[in-house]
Amino acid sequence: MKKHAKRKRDSAQPKLWLFPAVLVLLLANAAPSHAQNLPRMSDGKPDFSGIFTQPSTVNPSGPRGTLIFNADKMAPLKPGAESLLYEPRNGDPRHDEPRAMCLPAGFPDGMLYILPIQIIQNPKYIAIIPELQRAARIIPTDGRPHRTGLEPSYYGDSVGKWEGDTLVVDSVNFKRWILDDYHYTDPTKTRWHSDALHTIERLKWEGNKLSYQITIDDPKIFTRSFSQDFELTLRPDWDQLGLLEYVCEENNRCAGGKCRASDGQ
């Protein structure tokens, strides 16, 4: 009887030696990882194609999200550089609010405006197209070097490369231009970047959102580089409608002439 009772107690005890094997089976049958679930192109790289809401800051604090140079994010200025960053309004809207006069928004302002963004991609290039002015940035993603001998431009020269599932876009050769929407918050000043601006963008999937980090390096103005994180939400329901037409010149009330502030669009 004692032996029989002991066998019953043994059979009631948990089989601890089975736990590692069960754990292995559970892990093997678990859902695929986030990396495996990413939309991918034919070459295996993440596919960012789609229409997204405008970038918004992650856990924002301070002014509106398009101001990437918020006080809590901006690096310290170099001595004497305040006059390069801040320019007083002079009454000429081509200087004070160039976008309202159909001039290019430039970068990074054009990327961070309050309109949708479409991304079109193939294994060689990615096209980032803001609805604002339809100013497409067509960026090679094969890791090639920057082009040489180009005139500085509003959107710079951009090249991309992959670091795992993150696309890294490096941009240089900018024309000195207005920086962001600071002129909407300060009636006396605008903010500008220098022609030494260098930006690095990092894009990667985080669920149905596209994580977007921009790093600003402007050695004529700031003592160091600094970054800010944004996110873009994928909107498949916007695919059928697409980006809307953005026409500025058709309503330009002073084309080719001398403009006044009241002539802004």
Predicted regions and their residues:
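N-terminal secretory signal peptides that target proteins for export/translocation
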Residues: 1-16
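Bacterial N-terminal signal peptides
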Residues: 17-30
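A composition/secondary-structure signal for short, hydrophobic, low-basic-content segments
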Residues: 9, 30-32
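PEST-like low-complexity, intrinsically disordered acidic/proline/serine-rich tracts
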Residues: 2-3, 32-265
